[in-house]
Amino acid sequence: MLRWTTAGESHGQALIATVEHMPAGVPVTKDEVSYQLARRRLGYGRGARMKFEQDALTFLTGIRHGLTLGSPISIMIGNTEWDKWTTIMSSDALDMEDPDNVAAMSSGRGAKLTRPRPGHADYAGMLKYGFDDARNVLERSSARETAARVAAATVARSFLRETLGVEVLSHVISIGASEPYVGAEPTFADIQAIDDSPVRAFGKDAEKSMIAEIEAAKKAGDTLGGIVEVIVEGLPIGLGSHISGEDRLDAQIAAALMGIQAIKGVEIGDGFEEARRRGSEAHDEVFLDDNGVYRNTNRAGGLEGGMTNGETLRVRAGMKPISTVPRALKTIDMENGKAATGIHQRSDVCAVPAAGVVAEAMVTLVLARAVLQKFGGDSLSETKSNIDTYLKNIEERMKFEGLEDGA
């Protein structure tokens, strides 16, 4: 089974992405990984850190001459600001008799962080793990970790492209209380136009409304969340399964998206709006003509019974406002219990555009895993052969002899 993990801290020496059980022969380039990481840094309302957060890439294992080997793949993303953090984030014990260490750890970025931010992992993490310094929590809980997920997903993107010819895209539906995008569904041909938008919007009216929201929040010393949508065209019927809850593809996608920092809700297709409809208005009727099976609607978002049904996969995720609010929120000091305001780290007003790219990454990884679960293969060519056989069987199954015109 395809498996991915990440390691590293926000201000540590590096982040590591590991991908296991990817078939041999999948093309991967540093340029493509760098391109996807750059997309993650996009967005109106990003903080100053994005100017520093360049991504120094190293392919450590599992790739030779631009192709995967079938062995574990590990990708390292170096921290270009590491020289500023070598003492503070040192993995070795510090000699606190050394005046330089004392100075580094007693003020500025090295000072102990004892005022947990409401909405962040600080408070629960300090208590759960017995830490007296919130840095031990926030370094790993930071959304900087998602850079490693995007790197891992770039390998999965190539796998999906090579095996199924599909691409994964996202766009921002709304930010804060902006007017949500309502209009034609974008296709992958629109991805450059979406990325060229400062808020990754597909529609100028929605873009203007989102930018206005961000400007207002910035002036008010506040932060914003929003809604992103991920779209995937061309998936075959039958990825996932109805057999058990954990095998349902919608459950896997929802879990992966909810695992992104600050994501608070997920809906497939029309999602919660479906709950307001009657059954006769909620489901996508099936028709057959000379060109094959078709539907006039896609309210299910491409998933029925935990399986892809051949329609476009459509998923939305809701991101809460960033927890590091410039006008710091009320909290308590964990050192003495006194009333305080939350610690302030360099952060963004709005990271919703970037969240769309991360959501793409997680959907990509889940889909790649589903493809390998369904079709297997130790090499790319073997997986493609298995897919071709399956698709031919589906095509044969859907040929109906003696069907009268209009039947």
UniProtKB/Swiss-Prot annotation:
Identification of the protein by name: Chorismate synthase
Disulfide bonds: none
Gene name, Swiss-Prot/TrEMBL: aroC
Positions with a binding annotation for NADP(+): 40, 46
Family: Belongs to the chorismate synthase family.
Keyword Flavoprotein: yes
Quaternary assembly: Homotetramer.
Function, in words: This reaction introduces a second double bond into the aromatic ring system.
Cofactor(s) named in the record: FMNH2
Catalytic activity field: 5-O-(1-carboxyvinyl)-3-phosphoshikimate = chorismate + phosphate
UniProt keyword annotations, A-Z: Amino-acid biosynthesis, Aromatic amino acid biosynthesis, FAD, Flavoprotein, FMN, Lyase, NADP
Residues annotated to bind FMN: 140-142, 261-262, 305, 320-324, 346
